[in-house]
Amino acid sequence: MAEATDVVLVGGGIMSATLGVLLKELEPSWEITLIERLEDVALESSNAWNNAGTGHSALCELNYAPLGANGIIDPARALNIAEQFHVSRQFWATLVAEGKLEDNSFINAVPHMSLVMNEDHCSYLQKRYDAFKTQKLFENMEFSTDRNKISDWAPLMMRGRDENQPVAANYSAEGTDVDFGRLTRQMVKYLQGKGVKTEFNRHVEDIKRESDGAWVLKTADTRNPDGQLTLRTRFLFLGAGGGALTLLQKSGIPEGKGYGGFPVSGLFFRNSTPETAEQHNAKVYGQASVGAPPMSVPHLDTRNVDGKRHLMFGPYAGFRSNFLKQGSLMDLPLSIHMDNLYPMLCAGWANMPLTKYLLGELRKTKEERFASLLEYYPEANPDDWELITAGQRVQIIKKDSEKGGVLQFGTEIVAHADGSLAALLGASPGASTAVPLMIRLMHQCFPERAPSWEGRLKELVPGYGIKLNENPERADEIIAYTAKVLDI
């Protein structure tokens, strides 16, 4: 007998937690069930050590504003990402202020920096600063080529550096480090207190649609072969990170045809030595290598995890065919179907430089990887750093009318035409934009409910519907409010 519920959220990460809280705030009477394949929430991509913890607000990430063919830098994409992060930040602040999260320990003030180290990159960074400084959301950004000034911002990165090497940096004091694992756990704890049912160690075996439009999920208990659970729901969200593609394919919705995925794994060096970690207080992003994917931009970060400060450097791209860190090596081959084979072949052929780059990364020894760290931290001691494996990211491959198939970086909502099912595919900027992504998903799937939600949404997100960059006075009010509540 199927257990009926209004909403099923598949995946125990930041996306399901965010959508769950939004729905509980907007539709308190709806019954919600969250199912997770592992024994707890936030053990895959949302776990603190499976992502970089950057509150992506485009202050330091150079790939969000590349140099155009005309020599001009357009800040539009960077502004869009910054606006989205501020929506998330407002939502988190409201939940803290209303006592719905335990505290604000999941977010810490950590300055964001960009550091570049050759003449061309220094010229680019100057142009980027010139394009950004006139924008409200970037007005506090600083730029310098003065080595002493840069040393004040990031002493470890300048100590022992060649005096003749050109360097330039920008600095934004309002950057953040976010423990998305802790945030997810706090959100789910709140949901459980509101009656949301959580089912752990549940693997989705099958997804079918019944004649009345309801979705039926057959799940198995990963610890007990006889522990079957069947759920029946009118709305299904597939937010299982890299596993969402496989679930989307199981659903059989026409909107999911032609989608494929390319998994990329990440490695980081981590330093937990207190005396070293205390000397660096910034997330410092550089320029990606030629041919490198956007998620491979090198950065030396301050991380605050479970009340302790660490340093982390990376990522180093790798390849494993599983879609989740605790997934199966058969994930990629089993995801290839007749409807996505051609798009995947076309995307693969068009991205040979990426394939070459990944092969080169895979062949690197630990010493060769450490040499990259020395470019950013010249006096780094190899004995103080351990190499850790972060989470899997599945990049989207989709059909394209002109190219056959394209590899797409970013996130994408794929929803059934009637709004009864939605999946979130892709990666960066991911968790930082969870709130605007889930609000957009809700409007797409429940258009008839949206008007009745406006009032509460404006309480949850005080600047809802407003572009902060275009409303300076309101931006000052909201940014000051969220900074005070979140202690950032």
UniProtKB/Swiss-Prot annotation:
PANTHER family per the UniProt record, alphabetical: L-2-HYDROXYGLUTARATE DEHYDROGENASE, MITOCHONDRIAL
Gene Ontology MF annotations: 2-hydroxyglutarate dehydrogenase activity; L-malate dehydrogenase (quinone) activity
Q: What is this protein called?
A: Probable malate:quinone oxidoreductase
Name the pathway it acts in: Carbohydrate metabolism; tricarboxylic acid cycle; oxaloacetate from (S)-malate (quinone route): step 1/1
What gene codes for this chain? mqo
Q: Name one Pfam family in it.
A: Mqo
The coenzyme or cofactor needed here is:
FAD
What keywords would UniProt list here? FAD, Flavoprotein, Oxidoreductase, Tricarboxylic acid cycle
Transmembrane regions listed in the UniProt entry: none
State the Gene Ontology BP annotations: tricarboxylic acid cycle
Q: Which reaction does it catalyse?
A: (S)-malate + a quinone = a quinol + oxaloacetate
Q: Which family does it belong to?
A: Belongs to the MQO family.
Q: What is its EC number?
A: 1.1.5.4
Keyword Calcium (UniProt): no
